[in-house]
Structures are given as structure tokens and as C-alpha cells.
Amino acid sequence: MHSGSADITTTSSVLPMITTPIWHYIDTNPAKWAQDTRYVTVFPDPVRRPGCCTTTEVTHMSRYFTKTLAALEPYTPGEQLKLPDLVKLNANENPYPPAPGVAAAVAGAVPGLRLYSDLTEAALCAAIARHCGVQPENILCGNGSDENLLLALRAFCDETHPLAFADITYSFYPVLCDLLHIPQHVILVEEDFSLDLSKYHGLNETIVIANPNAPTTLLQPVAAIEEVVRTNPDSIVIVDEAYIDFAGPNASCVPLTKKYDNVIVVQTFSKSHNLAGARVGFCVAIPELI
């Protein structure tokens, strides 16, 4: 036990339901918390998960980090309450259980987990291709759509070829840019949060457009995105369609991959397909890009 102001982290006991951020409960009297076995005082570090490094330990270990890693701000997820029948809008998880047939298929695949998976993911790519109306050679699977985005940026961006994206959009784009030393061209959204896609015409930069955009939910017509693709013939346009299945029919830009060689459409199984925990994503493009 130390003197001074105490921060709080949970022990293995179950933390009671708290809707107010836990730092509001930090008290200048450590003895008050010391009498409650549900909590353990930690000095001088901030609230953290049990088993994580302390601030002092991280500072000591950071001498090994690259400058890029040392400069990164850690990702702070939203509060993850473990309650039944809870719809977690902050995580955008599907609240409904999978169909019985899906659960049975997953259970039936368990014995095969002792074997390495097919590196080409041929069966999965074939099934996705049928669903999207393309050929298996147009599909590349990844560990969630984030890996597909990472691979695309590594392939088509560098210190001399920036990534252009909206200022209010998926927050992982700038993180990837920082990790890969990619310059960022941030394009402001309009007052109503819409995208003026004419600002993306002729940029000669790699472009990523979340459609529908997150968190604004606004959908761009396929024709408007096609004009971005058409006016950037020497650059890759990535269309991130994580939420496309909620946008209605004929909203996807997948058909553009049959018409243009510079467009990549990224989708995920995490949202409408109810497989966030499986981490399965894929992208659609011409075979030469795949």
C-alpha cells in the first residue's frame, strides 16, 4: 500500500455495473478503496486491465520501440459490458445469434482445426465469389477487413504516394498510415457530414472511401464513386463496404471491379454476417491486383 492518490483496477472479482466512467470514482483517500476487496490500488499508473504492463514498465521497455511505435497512441475500445441481451452500438456487433445451420457447420468444422488451413482459402473464395457474382480469382480473404486494408496500403502507398480519406470516417485509416509511414491527405466533409466526391477527382493518390461512411452512415451512389475511379486512372480507389448490406439493393461497388482495373472493394463478415469473432474479411478486384 502506498500513499497518495489511488487509481483503480479490478481484481478477478466481478466488477459491479458501472455506467459512469471509472475514473470518476477515483478517490484521494486510498483507505476507502483498500477496504473493498473488489478493487486493488495501483500507483502511479492509470486504470488498466489486470496483467497489463504499468506505465513505468512501458516507459522502461519503450527504449526498444521504433520511433513509429513509440509515437502511437494506444487504441482505447469502448466500454465492453458483459450483460445478456445487450445491443452494443459502440462495437457494432450483431445482437442476434447465428442461424442453427451456421452453428452446426461451425461445430462440424472443429475436428479439422488440428490441420493447417488451405493457404489459398479456395473453398471460401469460391463461396464468396458466387455471392458477389464474380470469379474466385477476384477474391482475397483476410483476417478481418482490416488486414485487407493493410495489405492494400502496403501495396499501393508509400512515402511519395499518400492516402486520401475523409476527416470523419473509419478511425483505423490514419493508424495504418502512421504504421506504414504513409502521408495522409485528409479531406474535410461538408457541414452536413456528406462527402463532396468532386474533391477526390484527379487526385493521383490512393483513395479510400467508406461507403456507407462510418460513423456518419451516409451512402454515396455507385455512380458518384465510379466518377472518382474514372478520374483517377493511375491510382487505386479502395471502397470500404463494411456496412454495405444495410444500404439496400444495388448499393455495392463490386460491379465496378468488372469495369475498371483500379478499384478494390473491401467487405467483412463481422457486421451483417454475424461473425465478428471469427475475423474474416475479403476484397474484390481484378486478378492482377489480387
Name the predicted role of every residue range:
Residues M61-L115, G202-L203:
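N-terminal "arm"/small-domain region of PLP-dependent enzymes with the aminotransferase-like
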Residues E190-A247:
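Active-site phosphate-binding strand-loop segment of PLP-dependent enzymes
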Residues E121-P162, L180:
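Phosphate-binding glycine-rich loop
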Residues I139, S235, N262-V263:
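Short, conserved active-site loop motifs that form the nucleotide-linked donor/cofactor pocket
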Residues K259-I290:
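Conserved core segment of the aminotransferase class I/II
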Residues M1-H60:
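Short catalytic/metal-binding and nucleic-acid-binding patches
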Residues A155-A210:
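PLP-dependent aminotransferase-like
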